[in-house]
């Protein structure tokens, strides 16, 4: 089963991806990991990619699709895979269709922007240990201090409200149109890929149950 997870940053895709890969015994593949692996392995495609990256240029969708086709032909993808952060744009999605990369299921995890801002902007981290807190959902015993060491907690730059809102605006302009693209593709293609819209609010367990039900 080949699965694409859609959803804004902070919607909980990473958490659900873990459950999907474990349940179906499929790898999670990201373009970043694929790029690094191909360059490291020195494959013909990897050497071509290295040239582009060394020149400080953006890797074309065409090269990315070649990379995807090479990756999904590997033995660990025999039962399928979960695409992580790909496709990000309509041209990439169209290129996958044109290249004959079939997708079985597309799951959209939908969460309101304000909910996401609240989730992410409320995170606090103890840098030395990696322990994470949330000022509303999982507050430390003493405000701004790590429970174990009493050291200061920080807010990562990625979690600052203005950063989160910028990432959400990029998502809405570039990636959200994929929702419409895959809904139309599914409707025009007798339900392949199977498209599922899931509300990403509630307990992790309840969302996981809905995601797995959509894929079964």
Swiss-Prot record:
The keyword Protein biosynthesis is annotated on this UniProt entry: no
Keyword vocabulary terms for this entry: ATP-binding, Cytoplasm, Kinase, Nucleotide biosynthesis, Nucleotide-binding, Transferase
A Pfam family of this chain: ADK
Binding site for ATP: 10-15, 123, 132-133, 202
Region NMP, residue ranges: 30-59
Main location: cytoplasm
LID: region residues: 122-159
Residues engaged in binding AMP: 31, 36, 57-59, 85-88, 92, 156, 167
Gene3D superfamilies: P-loop containing nucleotide triphosphate hydrolases (3.40.50.300)
EC number: 2.7.4.3
InterPro entries: Adenyl_kin_sub, Adenylat/UMP-CMP_kin, Adenylat_kinase_CS, Adenylate_kinase_lid-dom, P-loop_NTPase
Catalytic activity: AMP + ATP = 2 ADP
GO molecular-function term, one example from the UniProt record: ATP binding
Domain notes: Consists of three domains, a large central CORE domain and two small peripheral domains, NMPbind and LID, which undergo movements during catalysis. The LID domain closes over the site of phosphoryl transfer upon ATP binding. Assembling and dissambling the active center during each catalytic cycle provides an effective means to prevent ATP hydrolysis.
Family stated for the protein in its record: Belongs to the adenylate kinase family.
Free-text function comment from the UniProt entry: Catalyzes the reversible transfer of the terminal phosphate group between ATP and AMP. Plays an important role in cellular energy homeostasis and in adenine nucleotide metabolism.
Subunit organization: Monomer.
Protein name: Adenylate kinase
Organism per entry: Pseudomonas entomophila (strain L48)
């Amino acid at each position: 089963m080949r699965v694409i997870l859609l959803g804004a940053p902070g919607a909980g895709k990473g958490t659900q991806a873990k459950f999907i890969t474990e349940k179906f015994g499929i790898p999670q593949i990201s373009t970043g990991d694929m790029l690094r692996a191909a360059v490291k392995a020195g494959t013909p495609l990897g050497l071509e990619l290295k040239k582009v990256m060394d020149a400080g240029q953006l890797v074309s969708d065409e090269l990315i699709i070649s990379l995807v086709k090479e990756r999904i032909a590997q033995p660990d993808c025999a039962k399928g895979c979960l695409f992580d952060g790909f496709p990000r744009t309509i041209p990439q999605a169209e290129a996958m269709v044109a290249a004959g990369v079939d997708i079985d299921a597309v799951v959209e995890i939908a969460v309101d922007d304000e909910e996401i801002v609240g989730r992410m902007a409320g995170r606090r981290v103890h840098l030395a240990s990696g322990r994470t807190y949330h000022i509303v959902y999982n507050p430390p015993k003493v405000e701004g201090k790590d429970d174990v060491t009493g050291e200061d907690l920080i807010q990562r730059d990625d979690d600052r409200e203005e950063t989160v809102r910028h990432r959400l605006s990029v998502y809405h302009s570039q990636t959200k149109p994929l929702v419409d693209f895959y809904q139309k593709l599914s409707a025009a293609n007798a339900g392949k890929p199977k498209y599922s819209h899931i509300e990403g609010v509630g307990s992790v367990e309840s969302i996981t149950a809905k995601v797995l039900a959509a894929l079964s």
